[in-house]
Swiss-Prot record:
UniProt key word Cytoplasm: yes
Family: Belongs to the arginine deiminase family.
Example GO biological process: arginine deiminase pathway
InterPro entries: Arg_deiminase (IPR003876)
Organism: Tolumonas auensis (strain DSM 9187 / NBRC 110442 / TA 4)
Identification of the protein by name: Arginine deiminase
Compartment(s): Cytoplasm
One GO location term (cellular component): cytoplasm
Catalytic activity entry: L-arginine + H2O = L-citrulline + NH4(+)
Active site, renumbered: 399
Involved pathway(s): Amino-acid degradation; L-arginine degradation via ADI pathway; carbamoyl phosphate from L-arginine: step 1/2
Keyword Ion transport: no
Main location: cytoplasm
Length: 409
């Protein structure tokens, strides 16, 4: 592990360590008939997506970032007997597998090498992968190519299932059922893997509990510094969860202020970071057609640390964020393009979803020519990743990364 302590203390301070997930079996199992249910807009050319993801990783490593891949982390975690039992106890159950096949399936999975089991847990397990005939009502219902465990292609977007907020982490209850198992697997890595075991403070969230309507995803969470966290409240992160998150952060003494930004519920603006990200200093990039409509709510601890104080802030979001960080104003680089149609296209292709490696250095997709040019004109160095394949899941550099160690600014 890096010599630095786990924790993410800003959006643009030097990035020291990050978790990613290279495309693999889960993406080879995307089809035109199932990609919608698995939250992808299209199927991948997987071999090219892997090459492009390797470019993404290489750019980070070239700047000194320690890059960890969840495929390897999970494989190593599964080589620990206690961890394997914990994961399979919760993943291979009557509720998931049905009555009649749990014993045979569990006995087989207990003997698999860690890297093979990890590939099935992320990539999905089909009936034709089994060395035995499926049994029970569920097993016979599936047919020869049915999924016993559905694939998790959205694990590519490691940002969402957990969020490091200053010195601790949240284990996020995801909005869609297709993504909920990601949080369980990440929780196991944090609990059992030697890089994390005994070093992680969980601030909120538990993948073993039913959070009902309290859903939260990391694309909406930004620890911006100055003991403040910005949280998007839209399609994926609910006010029920954000209130609980604020309570937990205040009780742990993690922050003094939570700013909740209400965003339209739409596929194009599924998370705050699809329309707004930080680039360094007071420079941000934003899809202003959406960002200008956001309403901000200020949450702070109540008297004696009890309950929450809650106020709607009448100011535009950019002014709220500038004040929280001690700036007179933000320099906003809008989505590039001369027409509304061009700007909408570049936002759809994750033009505003950049990952800062350090102040003034970001990673973005190469396809967003106008937005990248605008950022470069503002003095931001843009390291470009091919985005034709990776962008089919609607996520850019920030979405494809879960920072675990980042400096303050």
């Amino acid at each position: 592990m890096s010599e630095h302590t786990l924790g993410v203390h800003s959006e643009t301070g030097i990035l020291r360590q990050v978790i990613v997930c290279r495309p693999g079996l889960a993406h080879r199992r995307l089809t035109p008939s199932n990609c919608d249910a698995l939250l992808f807009d299209d199927v991948f050319w997987v071999k090219q997506a892997q090459k492009d993801h390797d470019v993404f990783v290489s750019l980070m490593r070239a700047r000194g970032v320690e890059v960890l891949d969840v495929n390897q982390l999970l494989a190593e975690t599964l080589d620990i007997a206690e961890a394997r039992s914990w994961i399979l106890d919760h993943r291979i159950s009557w509720n998931h597998i049905g009555v009649g096949m749990v014993s045979d399936l569990r006995a087989w999975m207990d003997e698999l090498p860690g890297h093979v089991l990890a590939e099935f847990l992320i990539g999905g397990l089909q009936v034709n992968d089994l060395p035995f005939d499926p049994s029970g009502l569920f097993g016979n219902h599936l047919g020869p190519y049915g999924f016993i465990l559905p694939p998790l292609p959205n694990f590519l977007f490691t940002r969402d299932n957990s969020s490091w907020i200053y010195g601790g982490v949240t284990l996020n209850p995801m909005y869609w059922a297709a993504r909920k198992p990601e949080t369980l697997l990440t929780a196991a890595i944090y609990q059992f893997h030697p890089k994390f075991s005994g070093k992680v403070e969980v601030l909120w969230g538990d993948p073993l509990k039913d959070h009902a309507l309290a859903t939260l995803e990391g694309g909406d969470i930004m620890p911006i510094g100055n003991r403040t966290v910005l949280v998007g409240m839209g399609e994926r992160s609910s006010p029920q969860a954000i209130g609980q998150l604020a309570n937990a952060l205040f009780e742990h003494g993690t922050v003094d202020r939570v700013v909740a930004c209400q965003i339209p519920k739409s596929r194009a603006a599924m998370h705050l970071d699809t329309v707004f990200t930080f680039c360094g200093g007071n420079v941000v990039t934003a899809f202003t057609e959406v960002a200008d409509q956001m309403v901000c709510y200020d949450l702070r601890p109540g008297a004696g640390g009890k309950h929450l104080t809650f106020n709607q802030d009448p100011r535009p979001m950019f002014d709220v964020v500038a004040e929280a960080l001690g700036y007179q104003s933000l320099t906003v680089i809008p989505t590039g393009g001369d027409t509304p149609a061009e700007r909408e296209r570049e936002q759809w292709n994750d033009g505003n979803n950049v990952l800062a490696l350090s102040p003034g250095v970001v990673i973005g997709y190469d396809r967003n020519d106008d937005t990248n040019a605008a950022l470069e004109s503002a003095g931001i160095e843009v390291l470009k990743v091919p985005g034709a394949e990776l962008g089919r899941g609607r996520g850019g550099g920030r979405c494809m990364s879960c920072p675990t160690i980042r400096d303050a600014i």
